[in-house]
Amino acid sequence: MTGSTIAPTTDYRNTTATGLKSALNLPQVHAFVNDWASLGMWWFSIALMFVCLIIMWLICCLKRRRARPPIYRPIIVLNPHNEKIHRLDGLKPCSLLLQYD
């Protein structure tokens, strides 16, 4: 075997400060990620975190509001003839427990 070459391998042990691994050689991204603090972008990380928290909070509120059952308000009509409460929502009538003098 004359003239055989070994393909270059990527050393995954040499990772960036974030722990991300990539087979691509992107020096701009590598410099941006490693120099995040020196670029004055620390405030961007905090702002992005708060934006994500607000979005997640809104999603949870909207899901909970949609999942709530509708408020049940029975329609009750007093019938003067037989002292029973007649319900217009289809449920059984119940006896009037209040005694009037």
UniProtKB/Swiss-Prot annotation:
PTM comment, free text: N-glycosylated and probably also O-glycosylated.
Membrane topology reported for the UniProt record: Single-pass membrane protein
Parts of the chain that traverse the membrane: 41-62
GO cellular component: host cell nuclear membrane; membrane
Compartment list: Host nucleus membrane
Alphabetized UniProt keyword annotations: Early protein, Glycoprotein, Host membrane, Host nucleus, Membrane, Transmembrane, Transmembrane helix
InterPro entries linked to this entry: Adenovirus_Type-2_E3A (IPR008652)
Residues bearing glycans: N14
One Pfam family, short name: Hum_adeno_E3A
Main location: host cell
Family membership noted in the UniProt record: Belongs to the adenoviridae E3A-1 family.
Protein's name according to its UniProt entry: Early E3A 11.6 kDa glycoprotein
Lineage: Viruses, Varidnaviria, Bamfordvirae, Preplasmiviricota, Tectiliviricetes
